[in-house]
């Protein structure tokens, strides 16, 4: 008999013993692993999760949040916009500052807000430099469009800030609801999109709503003088209200141009880059205006409340612009424009919460007219887009899918 055979058999027996021991150890651990599982959990692999809530959250995120992420971003952005608007209203209409000739003007508010916002954009861009290209000025081929976005953005925000001096928060915000109709008109002029009679009629009806907000004296007569507390909420002077409304309409034009430019740029520039140009250009223009316009005086905040309000302007403005740009880039124009109506809910809330002021009957009628006309136009336009082959391709993330503005002589130089 070969003497090596017992050694082999012994080695195999030892190996068998080791394997058996490991299996026994594993089997001893199995009850502790499965003991916490309920019958429902053990019979359903789909619903099983250690936390118990993750699957539900993932399903909600997949079915509702992700498909509508653009709408969510826009809704949240408009909340921060409302916080910024109400801070502006309080700063511009402080009765003590008005009585002592220390009223803070819109350009000063814009300067402070945009300086804070621009600093925030620089910090954000350099922290995320690995994911944001060409910091801090963006790609050379889109810089001229970013500059144009900043210039038109200034007119848009100045129109709103000026109108807040003489109109209620809800009235000033309501005027901006003309932006969707004006955007459609500008799309016809610049992008050569269709502009139907229905859309033209809807725009005219919206203007009727604006007239009810302005309430000119030749139509509504001279209003009775009200107490000083009411004057803080809104002016009773028809001339002041008319000028404020016209400046607000000029701001609406700027907003519409911003929307088209951002849609053209698409994702060729990071959202924060658009905010950066907007804040920088607005700060520069505001600084020049304060130092060249004789009636402008730079007022240093003299109370804790004013410092807090100025700080809120900068922080809320930064978040608003960032989320707004991200939302516009991710959502179709029709659905995205519907979210602007959340601003009205916020505005009425602030008017009531801060000033105990409900809109009067004419403002309510104007509100209903403007909203109804705009919704009507958007609905008709959406229906037409479904039946025509001339739709714009949604912007994804490259230059090929951008709206071809260049063929309309808007980019002469490079």
Curated annotation (Swiss-Prot):
Its main location: membrane. Pfam families: EamA. Keywords: Isopeptide bond, Membrane, Repeat, Transmembrane, Transmembrane helix, Ubl conjugation. Coiled coil: none annotated. It is found in: Membrane. It is a multi-pass membrane protein. It comes from the Eukaryota. There is a cross-link at residue 40 (Glycyl lysine isopeptide (Lys-Gly) (interchain with G-Cter in ubiquitin)). GO terms for cellular component: cytoplasm; membrane. Residues 88-106, 168-171, 221-241, 291-307, 379-414 are cytoplasmic. The chain crosses the membrane at residues 67-87, 107-127, 145-167, 172-191, 200-220, 242-262, 270-290, 308-328, 358-378. Residues 1-66, 128-144, 192-199, 263-269, 329-357 are lumenal. InterPro entries: EamA_dom. Residues 20-51 are annotated as: Disordered. Residues 25-51 have a biased composition (Polar residues). To yeast YPL264c. PANTHER family: ACYL-MALONYL CONDENSING ENZYME-RELATED, SOLUTE CARRIER FAMILY 35 MEMBER G1. This is Uncharacterized membrane protein YMR253C.
